[in-house]
Design a protein with these regions (language model features):
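Exported/periplasmic cell-wall-interacting domains
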Residues: 82, 101-183
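Bacterial Sec-type N-terminal signal peptides, specifically the leucine/valine-rich hydrophobic h-region
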Residues: 21-24
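Solvent-exposed coil/turn segments that connect beta secondary-structure elements
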Residues: 53-55, 62-65, 74-76, 90-93, ...
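Short Gly/aromatic-enriched secondary-structure transition segments
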Residues: 65-76, 101-107
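Post-signal peptide N-terminal segment of mature Sec-exported envelope proteins
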Residues: 33-63
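Bacterial N-terminal signal peptides that target proteins for export
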Residues: 4-15
Length: 183
């Protein structure tokens, strides 16, 4: 059995921890763990900053970042608007009025992934909008909400977030919360 000095053991533990964190530093889970544990009780009003280039959203209270999230913004042809906005509506159980499915009276999906403006409604069916939970509308028809994250811009212009992050941003924001969307 090899006996090490206590100082050497601590040094080795520190090296292993450092190497592990360096290997994970690009993982969003590390960033999520670090920022999700920051107190949300910092005084000051919340604000939201979205970086389309980084595909990240940040929640601030004053100058303190209290949360961050991976996102999926608008794909080609459905770009997310850039500029300074503010939350104009909150809807915890929002559904899209444009995108969704045509469903028959028994609840069976007749036609999926439709644009209600362009796709003809099959007989004996009705439109059911795609769920967009924790919707924070910042410009007419555009908002942050829970949705699928394929790792690239893929939405119709909204900003999709994981469930737990969309909920965190939703609970922190209020009508009038500033939203800055940067290229």
């Amino acid at each position: 059995m090899i006996r090490r000095k206590p100082m050497m053991n601590r040094f080795l533990q520190f090296c292993v921890l450092g190497a592990t964190l360096m290997g994970l530093s690009s993982c969003s889970t590390v960033n999520d763990l670090i920022t999700s544990n920051l107190p949300e009780s910092h005084s000051g009003r919340p604000s939201i900053v979205v970086s389309l280039r980084e595909q990240e959203a940040y929640l601030y209270r004053r100058e303190y970042r209290t949360a961050s999230s991976r996102i999926s913004s608008g794909r080609e042809g459905y770009r997310t608007p850039i500029g300074r906005f503010q939350v104009i509506r909150k809807d915890e159980d929002h559904r899209s009025s444009l995108y969704g499915d045509y469903v028959d009276d028994s609840g069976r999906v007749v036609r999926t992934n439709v644009d209600s403006r362009r796709d003809a409604r099959p007989p004996h069916s009705h439109f059911v909008g795609t769920p967009m939970p924790y919707f924070l509308e910042f410009s007419p028809g555009y908002g942050l909400h829970q949705g699928y994250l394929p790792g690239v811009p893929a939405s119709h212009g909204c900003i999709r977030m994981p469930y737990w992050k969309a909920r965190q941003f939703y609970n922190a924001a209020h009508i009038g919360t500033p939203v800055v969307v940067k290229p």
